[in-house]
Swiss-Prot record:
Its EC number is 2.5.1.39. Its cofactor is Mg(2+). It comes from Synechocystis sp. (strain ATCC 27184 / PCC 6803 / Kazusa). One of its GO terms (biological process) is heme biosynthetic process. InterPro entries: HB_polyprenyltransferase-like, Prenyltransferase, UbiA_prenyltransferase, UbiA_prenylTrfase_CS, UbiA_sf. The lineage of its organism: Bacteria, Bacillati, Cyanobacteriota, Cyanophyceae, Synechococcales. This is 4-hydroxybenzoate solanesyltransferase.
Amino acid sequence: MVAQTPSSPPLWLTIIYLLRWHKPAGRLILMIPALWAVCLAAQGLPPLPLLGTIALGTLATSGLGCVVNDLWDRDIDPQVERTKQRPLAARALSVQVGIGVALVALLCAAGLAFYLTPLSFWLCVAAVPVIVAYPGAKRVFPVPQLVLSIAWGFAVLISWSAVTGDLTDATWVLWGATVFWTLGFDTVYAMADREDDRRIGVNSSALFFGQYVGEAVGIFFALTIGCLFYLGMILMLNPLYWLSLAIAIVGWVIQYIQLSAPTPEPKLYGQIFGQNVIIGFVLLAGMLLGWL
């Protein structure tokens, strides 16, 4: 363990920083697809114990993903302005502590998974290698955000099967919506680090699409809309769902217009990430009310 100086935050707070639990937007944006799935599968509000299990599971899993990412990137993050103060990058925590925190998060997620259906449990097991592989994908795969999006999609599969015990056509449509949505907002997020990523030599979708990155984000959001439109049709949801989808479409169109500006403000990328949390909750409300 790295020695704490008088000016350092306490150990427990440094671990919170490592898990990124002090940044709720990143935790919520993983929780949202899981909540979409559990509410649609339950055709309304699911049992509160199950809802709590899913929420805590996504919190543990997102924390695990953040720690694993920082362990992979501990020698890269100090070279990036946005990430250089992360605990492992700043050497505020040792690698051994990081591994220990990751194992605790994994054990917590596994313990919660035992309360789910057998299919959900095995989907949780299948998700772990994808979560662990994502940081490595940045070194060898030109669009690592696709790996992250597939990892995000497991939240849909796990949560839906936790309610029904199986997967349906609607599950896979929602999975597709989640994958495309994640590709969209995480590509925007990666745009903030383009110059650092290019200098260091790691891959990102923002670099891969180059000057057409705004158009790529627009296509990802359009595909998300297509999946959500089809989902509403096959589940025969009521007009309240369609209202929420219309609001989401307006939000995504505005974001696309902002990204199409010749020189977007750097702060725009983080703002769009946060706006997608709001859009996700608007859609969640529509999915809940869509069964009335």
